[in-house]
């Protein structure tokens, strides 16, 4: 089934609102195996909408129109679709009853004739009840093309799609997806390594997406069941993770988790809870961002002892008891300072782990180090590890954000090695 989404509303074309409905619809249709080939926005104009319907009817088997179902004069979607199909508009009894109840409960509201339009559907259409609003939707098949009209407000459209439309469209295979998350490898390198798999993909498919500091791979397949999909996705996942970088490192070393909502921070917090271990932090360039990220998760009082924000040399010395002369000798941006910050954070809070971040966020260099130079220390029973990362060519905010991601990844690896 080839689907097309037509968003009706001049406010979309003028940029007054963002068409989030198209994204939502495309995602939900993909989940049931319906491919969206076209997305279009058109203003509140009958002539242009008629022209677009003519084009859509020739190239798509499912045409979904969103918006323009309200009571005002510029709400003309149903009227225009009826004219295009040569059909009349009729009243849906359930929608009329909902209008009656709505105005009966609001005696101060004037029930003007244009309000009745919200209860109309194209003749022959299956009504799609509106759970949160008054404008009824509809689904109608004519000459092999299925036409659907949906309200524009997302609060009305989403429940109508989830509870009314999708169950009526679901036939055959569905689309199942799995998201792999990678850190420490760039999109260009990952795509180059996986070039053969990407170039020769049919089903299942894989698609890379770059985000700040990380890369995700979406694996998708059409199948009749989750079990069938898992078999296909497992094979592709293993093919991906068995690949190696140019340096001979397995991609398994860079894959840290699954899913849209997973993050390095969430992985670390859950693993600390599972192992019953605690962590403390001492931060310089990130100014508490690591600690704030930990605190975003509920129940972290069991794993997060506290921390220090020591931006200046003086505060590093005062709060962490690191001799100022040693800091001056080695520099605040150094392996020595990262080591001592991590060790003192751990010691002072009696935590299992002490993490530290010190470096150059920008825009100016510091102590001869270019912007993006970051030292991260991790102190634990087995000793202290310090890594140096270079996050060049980024904004100040990105340097700090990615530095925190590196810190979480360092903790993650330590937890997994235990």
From Swiss-Prot:
Q: Which Pfam families match?
A: CinA, CinA_KH, MoCF_biosynth
The record's InterPro entries line, in alphabetical order, gives: CinA, CinA-like_C, CinA_C, CinA_KH, Competence-induced_CinA, MoaB/Mog-like_dom_sf, MoaB/Mog_dom
Q: Which residues form the signal peptide?
A: none
* Matches recorded under SUPFAM superfamilies: CinA-like, Molybdenum cofactor biosynthesis proteins
Cysteines engaged in disulfide bonds, as pairs: none
Do you know which CDD domains this protein is assigned to? cinA
**What HAMAP family does this protein's entry cite?**
CinA_B
Family membership: Belongs to the CinA family.
State the protein's name. Putative competence-damage inducible protein
Species per Swiss-Prot/TrEMBL record: Streptococcus pneumoniae (strain Hungary19A-6)
The uppermost taxa in this organism's lineage are:
Bacteria, Bacillati, Bacillota, Bacilli, Lactobacillales
Gene from which this protein is expressed: cinA
